[in-house]
Amino acid sequence: MSRIVKKGIVKIDQEQDEETFRENLAVQRNASAFFEKYDRTEVQELLTTTLVSWLAAKDDARSQLETPCGLMSQMNNAGFSTAILLTPVDPTALLDYREVHQILRELAIGIYCLNQIPSISLEANFDQSSSCQLPPAYYDTRVGQILIQIDYMLKALWHGIYMPKEKRARFSELWRTIMDIDLDGKPQTTKNVFSEFSSAGLVDITNDPDFNGIYDEDMNEDPTYEPNSPEEKAVFMKYAESIMMKLTFSTVQIQQHENIFIFETAYWLSNAIKYNQDYLDICTYQRLQKRLYLQKKVIQKHFEKKKEIRRGMGYLKLICFLIPFLLSLKRKMKVPYLNSLLPPFSDDKVKTERELPPFIYGRDFKCQNFDYKQHQYFHVHGGIEFDISTHPVESALDEFKKNVEKIWECASSASAEDAGYKEVYPIPVMELNGKSYYVIHFELEIFYQQLYKTQWWVAINETVNNLKVKRLPLTEDQLHEQFKKKFGLKKAMKCKSIPFGVKSAVERGLSAVFYTFSRKTSSSTINVSDEAGYAIFHHAALHNRVSVICQLWSANFNVNQRRFIMFSQADSSKVDMKKERNGPTPLHLAAQACSLEATICLLCFKADYTLTEKRGWMPIHFAAFYDNICILIALCRKDPSLLEAEATAENQCTPLLLAATSGALDTIQYLFSLGANWRKTDTKGNNIIHLSVLAFHTEVLKYIIELNIPELPVWETLVEMLQCESSKRRMMAVMSLEVICLANDRYWQCILDAGTIPALVNLLKSPQIKLQYKTVGLLSNISTHVSIVHAIVEAGGIPAVINLLTSDEPELHSRCAIILYDVAKCENKDVIAKYSGIPALINLLSLNKESVLVNVMNCIRVLCMGNESNQQSMKDNNGIQYLIQFLSSDSDVLKALSSATIAEVARDNKEVQDAIAKEGAIPPLVTLFKGKQLSVQVKGAMAVESLANCNPLIQKEFLERELTKDLLKLLQAFQIDVKEQGAIALWALAGQTLKQQKYMAEQIGYNLIISMLLSPSAKMQYVGGEAVIALSKDSRMHQNQICEGKGIAPLVRLLRINKIPEGTLLSVIRAVGSICIGVAHTSNPMSQQFVVEENALPVLIQLLRNHPSINIRVEVAFSLACIVLGNNSLKKELQNDEGFEYSDVLYLLHSKDKEVCLKAGYALTLFAFNDRFQQHLILETGLITVSIFEPFLQSSVETERAMAAFQIIILAKAIIDVEHVTLYGRGIQILADSLNSVHAPTIALTGNIIASLAHSRAGIPEAFVSLGTVQRLCYHLYARSEEVRTACSCALGYLTYNAHAFRLLLTECRNKPNQFLRITNNISKDAKINPAFLKEFQLQQRMGLPSLSLERNGGPPVIPVFKKGKEHRQKTRPKIQPRDSLTLLPPVTNVKELFRTTHKANISHNTFSFPSGVSSDIINVSRPRIAFLNKLGKDEQKANPDPPAFLNKLGKDEQNANPDPAESQ
């Protein structure tokens, strides 16, 4: 560098022109003006920093300094006059050339003249404002503005608070006045503090659209850790004042070819805690680090969302390279030629803020990182630093070398274009090597003084020398003023004590103050240690005070100074001061506190980076453990061998092993990228996996898993730890697995493949309750997978889990119940029952802990699904009474869950149904529907459905309690699942008789029925179809009303839906047919026409021919027969227009399914009923032989024989191998014999068939009469079954059109007058009876009946009648009495179900079973993700002899407290 001129402007001789003189004068004036922007204190700081900087050009110093690694020590030939820089482009935030030139100009002045590199540190003032502590050379510069802008946004995201620049600049001037701050920094105002800040422009940062909702996302992947728990917040706030969040930039790649430099930079977000180990132990540090890591993740994810921030980061990356580049040029005696740069910004455009106003939280602010009191404002702290060491310089790639000329052309073209003023000065961009690069160039000049000319750096240096004499050192008043401004009056007074003042100045970074103290005080006084043994050098390194370090080094202080401590002698009253031989050096503390500038400075001062402290740690071990990547980079660049340096004491860990121990994930990733040896282990054989597990750093484990290195088998290592003898290693392995399995949906498979399950099952047999608890917690998290369940069963896990149910820990019971729940869902119900699982679970129902009861009942519910033996076990072991008692609990969850459990215990098991009803379940179930919780009512409806299914007595009891009204309310709910359950429960109460079903359908009403048909729910559609069948069966009035109410269209619409469940489709098809057919196989032309007009025939024909289900096809055939029954025009339309042929049905007669075959015959029977032409068509289409019907005619099932007899009578002329007369006789004889049956369904069916045949063909009624049918029918009028009485009355009604039957029945009624009443009371409204018969009987009645004359004369009645007492009379009339009561077939069953047996009258009305599983709702299993150990032993165990006594407390006292993560570990 040029020798500084000592005095004034160089005198010019006569040959020097006047212009040179003016230029020199202007340079001198500009140099003086440069310092005018500083006040006195700032000038003093500027001068001190400039004079003491290790970057100062001192010949005696340079020989003793080591040059930072990379560019500064490796730059090749610098004989070029123009530098060209290439750096990658961010197309979303383009840089501006004028800004770049402004930055270059400011850096040149700061580095070449003032020996300062840019950085920023926000420091706390005593009044809670924050000082923007820039190197004084960068006050009022564009560099300073960018640093403040980026750092402020970093702190804004960290705290969730923001104030725009213009508003905060104004508020900085006024806030002290508004708050009425006193000399101690305390506010004296009575105003609302937050309101004042808010009105000044302070807002929640989430109000910005770019940052909306950023704190709502949960970054925490460890369920064991609750960062916002009161305990975690309290610990964090204890150290919050000393926690920093800072950005560090480093150049990670440099290539050079001649004067072209290609570089890339990166940045890291780091946190540092400015405490040494005496005040912050390692455990607390890791606790703080865990919370800080989550905060960093949020900032890293959202920091660059705004374009201005991305642009600012682009400038900082450029600055990161320019600093070592300019330092290198300075060493090569080259300096940027500032006159060639674009015009600088005016001074008013580069003003920097000297301080920032405090932050304060509003009540509704989203960020919860800090926990300050309401109306408490606070300062912010952190910074930005640049690593001046760089990656080694490499030769440029061939791609760049080949395009040198193009690069030059691009750079020179930009120079020509930059002339003149522009709003934007774009930087030229080139595409090279597949990437876009900025092409930045600037000219250089020689860094020497020229004769007769004063360069700008010479003028500035001369001004500095002149000011030094005037401004340094500080006076006593100036010292006090500085302390008072930074610390307040009280602490300023304390600072008059030199040791205290020196330490305070070092911690706060007051360079001029320390400079003054060092001039006034001896070295021994300056270097005094504090009570903890730390000297000023240690504090300077800890707080990153480079200027102080430089002054200490200049004063020949030991750069490797160890910590001093006081030892007290046991046998002496003296206290000796002894040097701690293995205490930390300043470099250790700088590495711990992420003091990057201090670290590089100390390395340049030749600090020994191989020294170890008492644990054997070198500085690189500190950097690795405390996750300070930037320090690690600087040290590894200094000496690459440090990458594998082992600690000399304790476990001899490498940096990678220490990083794994502390969970420093960023450092681990960087060390892997450098190729660190991950095979190394400590002295105990622990590798990074073991150490991560033992320290419970699951994030590190997940990273290693994703690396997928075969030699680092995480899963196998965990299994090995599960099987070792150390209880701690087993526990930590289980805890790690518990967290990891929740991190990724596919990890359960890895756990399974590694053979973990047998090892876990073995741990269940351990005597350690905590280990058992953690193990079942892990298993309950992965047992949702079928493969895991199979592995648990194969490893003998079921008896081990059931044995744990006898322990005294409710939390253990809860987790075991979850596992058994999952096991039971995978078809292992009988295995659980085999090991007495159900009695053990029933015993747990006496506990008073809701979370346990929820899981136990869920387990019981699943065990009883479709398992009759388990249902019976619940009854035999007195489990039902607990379930019933829970129905009266105050907990809605228990009410709902007990209802759902009762539903599964009772499903399809009449014995258990009766037992539940006997225990008194019905009253509390009905009471559930009086509450307001819809979810509880839904589960109650589920229980009602299960109990009432095929159980007339329970149905009657529910109906008598008017439950129908409550269930109908569920149909009006908005949620589809609520409607579904309500509909299914209602239809379960409809029972199996037509009368009851018709009553229920009438209660539902036409509107709701049609609404169900229009619903997207298959269950609703099914119930709607069944309701239509019930209403329309044998009731022309209802059929017509459905047609008029537009009920046909929804049915036909459902027929057109492709993806509809088969059971629903069957119901809809039957409903369409049922609407068209009446009593005794009469037709309804009106409804038939409505169906045809809705274009149902083409849809049905398509289903008949194309549907894959044969059950659907045969049902369609039957419905088609109903639609065209007795309607010749529709038959012609069906056959001519729709192409229907009997071959579409005839082949079904040969089906292997007997029910299909019988139903197909029934369909053909309806087509041929009273239609000889159709019988002829059937005969021509296919050959029907009696052998088809023979299996049914000889069947042991009476209803099958009766139906087959009906078919052969109607189809007699279409059967080719037997005379039709023979078939008539055989069929009639079978039907006549069927009337002798003792089974009501057989008699009812036979009566309806006789009614149909009575108006079918001449001669058939006479044949029935000759066989004594009239007498048998009259006998059955006394039957208890209403269906039998109705069917027989209809048959007698139609037989009255036969003269012989007319006379027989008239005689019967004359002799038994009540017989006539029985016929007329029971006959269906749509059935026919001969008017002549009615008229004749009335005539006979008026004339006097023989039986009545006997009674009138005192004789006994012909038929004895038992008269009940008054108390019984009200029960003689059924409560449910709809207008129509005739039945042919139970309409909610298909024919095959009716004909299956004569021994079971109660046939399930469901044509298919709906899933009985429960959707995700209130009764879900309580499956906590993590088993917290602090919950063990907290619940008092006691049996509950009287369950209702404690049920009132459940639901009120159960709170899932968030445990302390430390305790859980």
UniProtKB/Swiss-Prot annotation:
Keywords, sorted A to Z: ANK repeat, Membrane, Repeat, Transmembrane, Transmembrane helix
Originating organism: Mus musculus (Mouse)
ANK repeats (start-end): 532-561, 582-611, 615-644, 651-680, 684-714
Name this polypeptide is given: Ankyrin and armadillo repeat-containing protein
Cell compartment(s), UniProt: Membrane
One Pfam short name: Arm
GO cellular component labels: membrane
Spans annotated as Disordered: 1431-1465
Listed InterPro entries: ANKAR, Ankyrin_rpt, Ankyrin_rpt-contain_sf, ARM-like, ARM-type_fold, Armadillo
Membrane-spanning residues: 313-329
Topology relative to the membrane: Single-pass membrane protein
Organism lineage string: Eukaryota, Metazoa, Chordata, Craniata, Vertebrata
ARM repeats: 745-784, 786-825, 827-865, 868-907, 910-949, 1085-1125
